[in-house]
């Protein structure tokens, strides 16, 4: 139903579907992976009572910035996507959208996100420039370093810091525990994602943690996920979170254990499904935080 609704927008403009695909609106998994930790941080910053305006600002902000990030990512990869099986049908790779149009879409989406940030406060506005810089540089990192997933983690975690400044006007040191936890988690699940393209990436010279980790990939991913949960436990203690939060962490831990088992043969599609599965871990933690505050 969701895809049918998106495709119906072609009635408004014959190329609407091409731009929606460029913004990856047909694949909302990236929205979920960015949204859950952002909302977790917002709920904690607001002690379980975030304003509706902040919830809307950060929810729509996540959608816009993730879409913009996809546009600039495809711009950066436009010359290599056609050589990778999973990406050879992307709009830039097939010529349905031009490089100039992709840059314009990136600018429009980031501009719209910035208008939302202007509804917060000066500190959050200044922080938003860091988010823009990370979003713009991440797609190019895979040409120069084996750690592009770390840059993605930094970008995907930036909204956590912004929720605290938007809510309270300041950034407590403990918020960095949530930031580090999400960065570690992101590196883990995006390594699963990179494992789906590892053979193609080796041929075309694209770098990733999946290539760097080699045969230790799954063990390192599980270690990163465990460290992420450890940081969340520490943050939970600092923010006085209790049983429901810990239950959410337990469900997330079960998700991580299942992913480790499921990818034991490193099948490409299984690695991709493990990447998608991380959405449920993030949702479990968010629900745990919401219930922990709501049922006090």
Swiss-Prot record:
Q: Which UniProt keywords apply?
A: Cell inner membrane, Cell membrane, Magnesium, Membrane, Transferase, Transmembrane, Transmembrane helix, Ubiquinone biosynthesis
Which biological process, per GO, is one annotated for this protein?
ubiquinone biosynthetic process
- Give the E.C. number(s): 2.5.1.39
Q: How does it sit in the membrane?
A: Multi-pass membrane protein
Q: Which residues cross the membrane?
A: 28-48, 52-72, 102-122, 146-166, 169-189, 219-239, 241-261, 275-295
Location in the cell reads:
Cell inner membrane
Question: Cofactors per UniProt?
Answer: Mg(2+)
What's the superkingdom here?
Bacteria
Which pathway, metabolic or otherwise, does it act in?
Cofactor biosynthesis; ubiquinone biosynthesis
Which of the seven top EC classes does this enzyme belong to? Answer: transferase
A single GO CC term, please? plasma membrane
The protein's annotated catalytic reaction(s) are: all-trans-octaprenyl diphosphate + 4-hydroxybenzoate = 4-hydroxy-3-(all-trans-octaprenyl)benzoate + diphosphate
Q: Identify one Pfam family in the record.
A: UbiA
Molecular function terms in GO for this entry? 4-hydroxybenzoate polyprenyltransferase activity
Family (UniProt): Belongs to the UbiA prenyltransferase family.
Entry function: Catalyzes the prenylation of para-hydroxybenzoate (PHB) with an all-trans polyprenyl group. Mediates the second step in the final reaction sequence of ubiquinone-8 (UQ-8) biosynthesis, which is the condensation of the polyisoprenoid side chain with PHB, generating the first membrane-bound Q intermediate 3-octaprenyl-4-hydroxybenzoate.
> Any idea what this protein is called?
4-hydroxybenzoate octaprenyltransferase
Name the gene that codes for it: ubiA
